[in-house]
Amino acid sequence: MRGLLVLSVLLGAVFGKEDFVGHQVLRISVADEAQVQKVKELEDLEHLQLDFWRGPAHPGSPIDVRVPFPSIQAVKIFLESHGISYETMIEDVQSLLDEEQEQMFAFRSRARSTDTFNYATYHTLEEIYDFLDLLVAENPHLVSKIQIGNTYEGRPIYVLKFSTGGSKRPAIWIDTGIHSREWVTQASGVWFAKKITQDYGQDAAFTAILDTLDIFLEIVTNPDGFAFTHSTNRMWRKTRSHTAGSLCIGVDPNRNWDAGFGLSGASSNPCSETYHGKFANSEVEVKSIVDFVKDHGNIKAFISIHSYSQLLMYPYGYKTEPVPDQDELDQLSKAAVTALASLYGTKFNYGSIIKAIYQASGSTIDWTYSQGIKYSFTFELRDTGRYGFLLPASQIIPTAKETWLALLTIMEHTLNHPY
């Protein structure tokens, strides 16, 4: 086994994969606003090359940060000198990546049908796109594949449409993987797609939903970034677009929407993980969805799925003001997380983005809500930080199954409360 790990590191070096040997993920606990500001100072020190998995928000909210090996001592000294407590969540990031790669390699095979497809492992972009074609071929009267655009690097952007007939019927939109490193989301999206085809005509409650509402599912919302997480840098979050005047690549596609764009909660620095881009909708991956939603004109629920933190959130992210539908969205969130917890006891918190996690401007669901899509939600799936973005493949199916129960709750509510 040790030999395999050494081999994987060597192969990574040969094929140009970025390695994370000795990188640690620290969980920082801030006691007051002064400590929050100190951590923000740390965040601004670019030479440390810190990667905030959960950024500084408010006292009592945990902060998770990946620290490269050369920066570990400096970061720990900084925290200790300011009386800020921390613990090591992940001792060596590369060891988790090696385990992930070994698992993928061990279970890699070309599926001949969606029944033989392995839902309990992580897949490449090509494997997921092959899965889309299999699903459509097996369910031609229920599923179709729509290309809504091309990425910055020229890859097709696909959405699955599940429909029992008609055009521009009231619809539900679900997307996964807008942040490319959140692999459990794309994997869950694949499972959702199969689940829809299995349950239609078999499960009465779900059949009632699809008899009236269409479902659009975008499994790989950031294809360039996702391909890059497999080829080069597993920790890549953003798109892969180039910014004039900067050597840094990519825009945070969840800060690029035209809702509070460029306000606090996003960065104007192209090297930041939360860089908002030159202007709203600058990213074709975002603009493709914007154009689709506007052209469709009848989307009633919009659900964007991220990881991690175990949260279900509704607008707003860029301001503290409650949305007009606050009470209904809060009650629906409560019902959805209760349904989710009924399977394995997984606890999700819920609330508006700005209160549940942190201020985020230019986010997906703030824009969709501004377009009149009342049931606009964002999930943060498993876990709460033990593995973070590197959730073991053994948790894919349990994550997807419990999330499906929450999605069903939202979809049923959308069906029963037309507007």
From Swiss-Prot:
Zn(2+) binds at residues 179, 182, 306. Belongs to the peptidase M14 family. Inhibited by interaction with the S.magnifica carboxypeptidase inhibitor SmCI. Keywords: Carboxypeptidase, Disulfide bond, Hydrolase, Metal-binding, Metalloprotease, Protease, Secreted, Signal, Zinc, Zymogen. This is Carboxypeptidase A1. The lineage of its organism: Eukaryota, Metazoa, Chordata, Craniata, Vertebrata. Coiled coil: none annotated. Residues 17-110 form a propeptide. GO terms for biological process: leukotriene metabolic process; proteolysis; proteolysis involved in protein catabolic process; response to cadmium ion. Pfam families: Peptidase_M14, Propep_M14. It catalyses: Release of a C-terminal amino acid, but little or no action with -Asp, -Glu, -Arg, -Lys or -Pro; leukotriene C4 + H2O = leukotriene F4 + glycine. Carboxypeptidase that catalyzes the release of a C-terminal amino acid, but has little or no action with -Asp, -Glu, -Arg, -Lys or -Pro. Catalyzes the conversion of leukotriene C4 to leukotriene F4 via the hydrolysis of an amide bond. It comes from the Eukaryota. InterPro entries: CPA_M14_CPD, M14A-like_propep, M14A_act_pep, Peptidase_M14. The active site is at residue 380. It comes from Homo sapiens. It is an enzyme of class 3 (hydrolase).
